[in-house]
Amino acid sequence: MSAIENFDAHTPMMQQYLKLKAQHPEILLFYRMGDFYELFYDDAKRASQLLDISLTKRGASAGEPIPMAGIPYHAVENYLAKLVNQGESVAICEQIGDPATSKGPVERKVVRIVTPGTISDEALLQERQDNLLAAIWQDSKGFGYATLDISSGRFRLSEPADRETMAAELQRTNPAELLYAEDFAEMSLIEGRRGLRRRPLWEFEIDTARQQLNLQFGTRDLVGFGVENAPRGLCAAGCLLQYAKDTQRTTLPHIRSITMEREQDSIIMDAATRRNLEITQNLAGGAENTLASVLDCTVTPMGSRMLKRWLHMPVRDTRVLLERQQTIGALQDFTAELQPVLRQVGDLERILARLALRTARPRDLARMRHAFQQLPELRAQLETVDSAPVQALREKMGEFAELRDLLERAIIDTPPVLVRDGGVIASGYNEELDEWRALADGATDYLERLEVRERERTGLDTLKVGFNAVHGYYIQISRGQSHLAPINYMRRQTLKNAERYIIPELKEYEDKVLTSKGKALALEKQLYEELFDLLLPHLEALQQSASALAELDVLVNLAERAYTLNYTCPTFIDKPGIRITEGRHPVVEQVLNEPFIANPLNLSPQRRMLIITGPNMGGKSTYMRQTALIALMAYIGSYVPAQKVEIGPIDRIFTRVGAADDLASGRSTFMVEMTETANILHNATEYSLVLMDEIGRGTSTYDGLSLAWACAENLANKIKALTLFATHYFELTQLPEKMEGVANVHLDALEHGDTIAFMHSVQDGAASKSYGLAVAALAGVPKEVIKRARQKLRELESISPNAAATQVDGTQMSLLSVPEETSPAVEALENLDPDSLTPRQALEWIYRLKSLV
C-alpha cells in the first residue's frame, strides 16, 4: 500500500490503521469506528465492488484524500456472509479502549478473523451442510490431507496414495477453504477451487505438527489416536490447527481428538462416480432429484449433515451396518412420536462449538435450554424400545438436569439477539443486578410523580416530563406558556412549538439512572461470561450428547423412509455378489408419474459380468445406477428399494457413465472417457462394483468396438470385478460364448410402425435390434430424414447381412463392410511378367504404376 511509504505524515488514527493493516495485508480489514466498520484504500475499493456499497473519500491524510467504504455494525453479519460466499476473508478490528480515558486514538485490535473455512456464526453457515477447513500436503510418497469442521470440532486426516484418490477426497469433502504449501507441485489438482490459501513451508513441519496436536489434546504422543504413523497427514493437520488458532484468536476446547480415515474402512468412490450417482448434487449442480433429496427427511440440521457424511463414506464393517439395520427395524413403530420431539432439539452441535469459542449468543443459550428440555421426554420414549443400540444411544444422550435448571434460572424466555442490548439475564438470578435494574426501571414512576408535582406547583397545564437519547431527561412547556417557566428551569433545547428545560433535581436523577443502566449492563455481561465458565466443564459430555442425538435423528429418519417408501432390509453375504429381487431406482421412482418397473439383478462369482443391450431411453443407465445406489444404501446401513437383496463385500464403486468435454483441461469427451476407464482398469478388484456405459464412443467404429471388447475381456477374465457393461456394439453379445462368468441381458421395447414403446423390463439374452431410428423419430428428427435413414439401413444390411455377427477377436472384421473394387495398379501387376522386362522397361513400369495409385 502506497500509504505506508510516508507513514509519519498520516494522522495518528490512520497510523494506527496502517499498522493493523500491515499485519493482515492479504485480507480485508473491518476497522471499528463508532457505529460503523470502515474500510480504507484498496480494501475500500474491493469491498465496494464485492458488496455493492458506496465508495467515498474521508478527508485527507498525508495530503491525499482517503478512499473509504463503511458498513453499520448492526448489519455486519449480512455483509460477512456475502464476502465469505465469495471466498473472501475478513479481519474484525474492534475498539477495546475506553474513549473517555484514551489520549489519542482509542486502542483497537483484531479480535477475530472470519474466513470461509473457520466460520461458526449461524448467519454465515448453511445449516444442512458441513463447512470444512482443509489442508493438503505432498511429498514423494503421496499426499497428506486433513479436514476440520470448526462448527462441530470434527477433525480428520488421511493419506491418499495417488492423484486420483486425492481428487476423490477433495470432491467428497468439498472444503470451503484449502491450505496448501508454497511449493505444492500438483497445482492442477486444486486450481479453480474456492478459498485457496498459500501457506509457508514451515507451517507443515512434522515436529511442529506433533507439538501443536499434543498441546491441543493435552497428550504426550498421538499413539492413542492411531495417527502416529501418518506423517504426511500430520503435516497437513499441524498447518490446519495453527491456522484455526490464528484466525479464532482463542482456545479451541471443542477440538479434543483427531481421527484417521483409512481406505480399507469405507467403500471408495472416485470423483466421477460421486458425480454420476448424483448422491448429494445433481449433474447440473443443484440438490433436486439426488439420493439425499429422497433419503433426507431428518428433523435437525446436525442429523442432515451426518446423513450426508454417511452417504459419501459408506462403511465396510458389517458389525456397524447390522447394528444400524437393527436400530432402524426397532425404531419403525416409534418414528411418529420421536420426530416431533427431535425437531425441537435444533442444531445443538453448532451451538456447542460457539459455546467453546465463547461466541455463543443469548438465543444460542435459549436454544440449548430448549434442547435440554426435550431430553426427559426423548429418554422416556426410547426406554420402551427393545434394542441394545438404541439404549446405548439413550445413555450417551444424557439428561443434563442441572444445566437445564441453570439456564432456566439465568436466561429470560425470549432473549434479545446480542448481550450488549441488555435484558438477557432473568430477574431473580442475581440480587445485585436486580437492584441496579430496579433503580433504572423505577424512572417511570419517578417521572410521573415529578410531572404531577411540577404541574401543580407552576400551574402550567402543558408541562410534560420526558426523555430522549440525545438530550436525556427534560421538562417540556409549550411555546405559549414558556414565558411563565420558573427561574430555576434551565433551558436545554428549543423546539418549534415548545421549550425544554432541566432542573438540578432531574439532572441528579438522570446521572443516577444512567449510571445504574451502565452498571446493570456491565454486570449482565459479566454474568453472561460466567455462564460460559459454568457450562464449558461439561463440553465433552454435551458434544457426545449432540452426536447421539444427530445419529438418532438419522436412524429415525431412515426408519421412516423405509416404512413410507416400502424399502426392505438387505442381507450381507460373505462371497462377492449382488442378488436383487424387484429392485427400483430410489430417485427415479419418486419423480415418475407412473409406477416404476422393478427389475431383478444377479451377479455372483459364476456370473460376474452382465452385457446390457437395448434401445436408447430403454432404461439401461437407470438399471445400472439403481444397482450402485442400492449397494451404496446397503452400506450405510439403510433399508433399500427392492423386494429382497443379498449383497457381498464391496471395496469400491466405479462408474463410467456419460461424459462431457472437460474444456478447462483441454480434454475431449473421448479423452475423459478413456481417463476414467484407465482408472477403473488400474484400480478395480474382484470386490469392486463397476458400471461401464457405452465405452468406445467418440472414435471410429472399429477403434471403439475393439476398445470396448478388450475392456470387457479384461474386467471379466483378469480383474473379475462385478460389472454391468452397457453397449450398443452387438458384437459384444458374443462374449458369453467365449468366456466364463459373462451373461447377456437386455431391456425390452415394442415397435409398431414409426412408434416405439419402452418396456423398461430386463430380460435374459441379447437385444434383437437397437431401435435407433424409432428413437430418432420420437426425438423429432424430420420424417424425410428418417425415411432416407431407413433406405440407407436396408442398403447397408443387404451389403453386409452378417454385420451383427462380426467376429472381433478373429480376422473377420466385416461390420458394415463394402466389397472393395480391384485397384487398376493391382490389375496391371497381375498381367505383368517381370522376367520379360528390360531394365529400362522396368523403370517405365514403376512410373506407370505410380500414376495408377
Swiss-Prot record:
Pfam families: MutS_I, MutS_II, MutS_III, MutS_IV, MutS_V. It comes from the Bacteria. Coiled coil: none annotated. The keyword Nucleotide-binding applies. One of its GO terms (molecular function) is ATP binding. InterPro entries: DNA_mismatch_repair_MutS, DNA_mismatch_repair_MutS-lik_N, DNA_mismatch_repair_MutS/MSH, DNA_mismatch_repair_MutS_C, DNA_mismatch_repair_MutS_clamp, DNA_mismatch_repair_MutS_core, DNA_mismatch_repair_MutS_N, DNA_mismatch_repair_MutS_sf. One of its GO terms (biological process) is mismatch repair. SMART domains: MUTSac (SM00534), MUTSd (SM00533). Keywords: ATP-binding, DNA damage, DNA repair, DNA-binding, Nucleotide-binding. One of its GO terms (cellular component) is cytosol. This protein is involved in the repair of mismatches in DNA. It is possible that it carries out the mismatch recognition step. This protein has a weak ATPase activity. Belongs to the DNA mismatch repair MutS family. This is DNA mismatch repair protein MutS.
